[in-house]
Swiss-Prot record:
It comes from Marinomonas sp. (strain MWYL1). GO terms for biological process: translation. It holds the Pfam family Ribosomal_L23. The keyword Cytoplasm does not apply. It comes from the Bacteria. Belongs to the universal ribosomal protein uL23 family. Part of the 50S ribosomal subunit. Contacts protein L29, and trigger factor when it is bound to the ribosome. This is Large ribosomal subunit protein uL23. One of the early assembly proteins it binds 23S rRNA. One of the proteins that surrounds the polypeptide exit tunnel on the outside of the ribosome. Forms the main docking site for trigger factor binding to the ribosome. InterPro entries: Nucleotide-bd_a/b_plait_sf, Ribosomal_uL23-like, Ribosomal_uL23/eL15/eS24_sf, Ribosomal_uL23_CS. PANTHER family: 60S RIBOSOMAL PROTEIN L23A (PTHR11620).
Amino acid sequence: MIGERIYKVLLGPHISEKATIVAEGNGQYVFRVTGDATKPEIKQAIEALFEVKVESVRTLNHKGKTKRTVRGLGKRKDVKKAYVRLAEGQDIDFMVAE
């Protein structure tokens, strides 16, 4: 993968109640990724940026809701999420500041 593409694939971690439960129980982490990202690209990006071993990647496309506004109907953004399972004994700490 081209070095510049690594930084564009991952948009950031997806923090939610479900993501926290999955991280504690199964060693999975949830990331928001670009819509055109593939599973091998996501795996390479996470292994390069966080220096961990990725076991598997599952993705889902979450369609944005249609909402009513003063000017009519509007639509929220579509989001692609990646559920990443790390190898046994590996973890990612998002709170570390170096």
